Amino acid sequence: MSLQSIKYQRGSLEILDQLLLPVVSKYLTVRGVEDGWKVINKMQVRGAPAIAIVGCLSLAVEIYPEEFGSKKSLRQEIEGKLNYLVSARPTAVNMKISADELITLANELTKDDNVTVEDMKQRFLNATEAMLEKDIADNRAIGANGAKAILEHVAESASAAAAGPVRVLTHCNTGSLATAGYGTALGVVRHLSELGKLEHVYCTETRPYNQGARLTAYELVHEKLPATLVLDSMVAALLRVKNVAAVVVGADRVAANGDTANKIGTYQIAVVAKHHGVPFYVAAPLTSVDLQIPSGDHIIIEVRPDREMTHVGEHRIAAPGINCWNPAFDVTPASLVTGIITEHGVFKPSALKAEITKLLDL
């Protein structure tokens, strides 16, 4: 059974504090937008889909008990608070897209004379709650589409073990802890396991925040999936000797041309995968694709505090006085990406914009 990182019922929101994992499993109460901003910014909740859901639900629990004198005041509250939540971690595009959708809804309801202020509030709450259920359904579709793509690639290869279970590598955390449930890249791993086609999954430690060691390994052990943790610096050796069938990672933002911003270290894994002829897949919902950004050069990369590199907990591990560069993400060029796995199918980066434009009827 997948872990539950987000517990929600109308008027109440709790999140699993991911900074304490894997040693302590503790839920934090999110009482409103300020709490939501803090848990996102401090990375007590992380993963682009989960950030968007927790951000939007934090506003939902804040406005649930409130009474508004007019639709205009409610609209202003929604717009101002959602834009504030976007600033908590700007690289993850899902929060911005979700905010824009909800602001558009609020504007439309404000203009509709047949909608009362209470109706408007209820419809806003319904819309935020629908995001939670949709994310889980989308993740399951991503898992199925990704597993199918990997197995088809293996079947077409010259491998003697083409028909057997596969070995895959993943990076960072893209499972139930990064989404509303099931996961994106880790959802692909889960679906392979459900099909009886997963021989082994390797996960990187993912320095400096160790999301792979702390979170992905925690999920894999919890679900008793066959897994091995490797250091970030071991990936080249791993792909050379362990017959890995595919690499599958998540994404915080995908540009229109297929360039992908994901957890720092993703780019070098893609380079190594290309060298060894291992297909490299990005698993992400359409909400992670930003068609307004032509390429990865336009993606804002969040830079985290030096302390995350120089300390483990309260213990310093780097020489005092050393300079640090700590970007949270890097951008993998589309030329290194085999396919982008979405809830609607697997697309080549070169066809991504056209396919999504057609899907969304833009």
From Swiss-Prot:
Catalyzes the interconversion of methylthioribose-1-phosphate (MTR-1-P) into methylthioribulose-1-phosphate (MTRu-1-P). Belongs to the eIF-2B alpha/beta/delta subunits family. MtnA subfamily. It comes from Drosophila virilis. GO terms for molecular function: S-methyl-5-thioribose-1-phosphate isomerase activity. InterPro entries: IF-2B-related, IF-M1Pi, IF_2B-like_C, Initiation_fac_2B_a/b/d, M1Pi_N, NagB/RpiA_transferase-like. It is found in: Cytoplasm; Nucleus. Its EC number is 5.3.1.23. It catalyses: 5-(methylsulfanyl)-alpha-D-ribose 1-phosphate = 5-(methylsulfanyl)-D-ribulose 1-phosphate. This is Methylthioribose-1-phosphate isomerase. Pathway: Amino-acid biosynthesis; L-methionine biosynthesis via salvage pathway; L-methionine from S-methyl-5-thio-alpha-D-ribose 1-phosphate: step 1/6. Keywords: Amino-acid biosynthesis, Cytoplasm, Isomerase, Methionine biosynthesis, Nucleus. GO terms for biological process: L-methionine salvage from methylthioadenosine. The keyword Amino-acid biosynthesis applies. PANTHER family: METHYLTHIORIBOSE-1-PHOSPHATE ISOMERASE. The active site is at D252 (proton donor). It comes from the Eukaryota. The record marks C172 as: Transition state stabilizer.
